Amino acid sequence: QRKMFSRSSLGFFVVNRQTSGDYDFLDPENKYNRVIGIDYNLASADNSWTGKYYLHKSFQPGDSKGNYSGQATLTWQPRRFRYIFDIQYVDEDFRADLGFVQRKGVLKNGNGFSYNFYPKSGKVSLHGPGAMALYYWRPESEWKKIDHTYSLYYNINFTNQATFRFDFR
């Protein structure tokens, strides 16, 4: 991982899971799984812009085209407001044997907005209402929308780093 600009970083990784022998009981498709990736974490000097971006590719026996997973999350947070944009795609054939993949063959898009109040004293460092919308599509099925979530919430952050959130979906 390398630092870029004032507070951002860029990282590369390789994960290799491979059997050490030729076993009769082993399915040939499970002999190995490799994932390579690049991750970028964005943080502006004043912390008003933050983001996380990644692109990963998996390799396994009988590999087909694709096998990608990618995500871009961008947050803009001046003092009182917070806006989040998130988009993620996980190809149907992406496989990470040494990690967790929630949904495959899905494009997820999310947007959120919140307003923050900052008390002058006390145990609460900030609190405020927010809204989030998440949509899920399946590109291989003519971009059919397969799920969505709408959320209204109230978030409370304490000075000891604890967080409490009421969520209505």
Regions of interest found by a model, annotated:
Residues R2-Q60, L126-G130:
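Surface-exposed extracellular loop regions of Gram-negative outer-membrane beta-barrel proteins
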Residues D46-R169:
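Exposed, low-structure sequence patches enriched in small/polar residues
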